[in-house]
């Protein structure tokens, strides 16, 4: 039994190490986590979106940037990572925990963290020394501005139930776009180490 466990550990270490690329493939697990997160967001619905129509806002989701051909492969990974990180940050707040069912919120945050952890296995290899420059990359700045608009909206609306419902619907759109980006990356080869 100990031998089998040791062998499995060795295989995992080799596949995720610098020589192996298993850790940098966009796996089915990542896509399953994304779908599960969307289902959780849907289940978090507490109000009818129709009752909050007066609070609607266009947050300027950079959908065309992600779904179009504007992003190159070397930009797509950092944008995907930033979208997931910002989504996690949004839901991992005191204001958020006051607005949602705690169990569903914890499951959503765990799912987002799992996606980020999976991407973290590749992040250093994909972004390397360019990491500091990528923070200033236009698509990343666009994503940050988009999420800042969401934070500003919530604050302006006093973190009301309707404001959170509008944001929940918006985050379903954003996570759908990030899933589309994951699919694009997979079609680009899936191996995030390849140029």
Curated annotation (Swiss-Prot):
Entry keyword Transmembrane: no
Major subcellular location class: secreted
Gene3D superfamilies for the chain: 1.20.1250.10
CDD domains on file: IFab (cd00095)
Signal peptide, first to last residue: 1-23
Compartment annotation: Secreted
Summary of the tissues where the protein is detected: Constitutively and exclusively expressed in the mononuclear cells of the extraembryonic trophectoderm.
Superkingdom assignment: Eukaryota
Record SUPFAM superfamilies: 4-helical cytokines
Pfam families membership: Interferon
Record-level GO BP terms: defense response to virus; female pregnancy
Bridged cysteine pairs (disulfide): 24-122, 52-162
Gene Ontology CC annotations of this record: extracellular space
Keywords: Antiviral defense, Cytokine, Disulfide bond, Hormone, Pregnancy, Secreted, Signal
Annotated GO MF terms: cytokine activity; cytokine receptor binding; hormone activity
PROSITE patterns membership: INTERFERON_A_B_D (PS00252)
InterPro entries in the record: 4_helix_cytokine-like_core, Interferon_alpha/beta/delta
Misc. remarks from the entry: IFN-tau genes are intronless. They evolved from IFN-omega genes in the ruminantia suborder and have continued to duplicate independently in different lineages of the ruminantia. They code for proteins very similar in sequence but with different biological potency and pattern of expression.
Entry's family note: Belongs to the alpha/beta interferon family. IFN-alphaII subfamily.
Task performed by this protein: Paracrine hormone primarily responsible for maternal recognition of pregnancy. Interacts with endometrial receptors, probably type I interferon receptors, and blocks estrogen receptor expression, preventing the estrogen-induced increase in oxytocin receptor expression in the endometrium. This results in the suppression of the pulsatile endometrial release of the luteolytic hormone prostaglandin F2-alpha, hindering the regression of the corpus luteum (luteolysis) and therefore a return to ovarian cyclicity.
Protein name from the UniProt record: Interferon tau-2
Top-level taxonomy: Eukaryota, Metazoa, Chordata, Craniata, Vertebrata
């Amino acid at each position: 039994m100990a031998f089998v466990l040791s062998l499995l550990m060795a295989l995992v270490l080799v596949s995720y190490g610098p020589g192996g690329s298993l850790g940098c493939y966009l796996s089915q697990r990542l896509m399953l986590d994304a779908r599960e997160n969307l289902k959780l967001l849907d289940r978090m619905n507490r109000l009818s979106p129709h009752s909050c129509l007066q609070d609607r806002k266009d947050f300027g989701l950079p959908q065309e940037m992600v779904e179009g051909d504007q992003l190159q492969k070397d930009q797509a990974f950092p944008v995907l990572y930033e979208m997931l990180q910002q989504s996690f940050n949004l839901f991992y707040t005191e204001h958020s925990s006051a607005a949602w069912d705690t169990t569903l919120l914890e499951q959503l945050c765990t799912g987002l963290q799992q996606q980020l952890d999976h991407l973290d296995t590749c992040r250093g290899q994909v972004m390397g020394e360019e990491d500091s420059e990528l923070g200033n990359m236009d698509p990343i700045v666009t994503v940050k501005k988009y999420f800042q608009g969401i934070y500003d909206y919530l604050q302006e609306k006093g973190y009301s139930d309707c404001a959170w419902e509008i944001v929940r619907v918006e985050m379903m759109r954003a996570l759908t776009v990030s899933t589309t980006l994951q699919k694009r990356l997979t079609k680009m080869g899936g191996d995030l180490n390849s140029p």
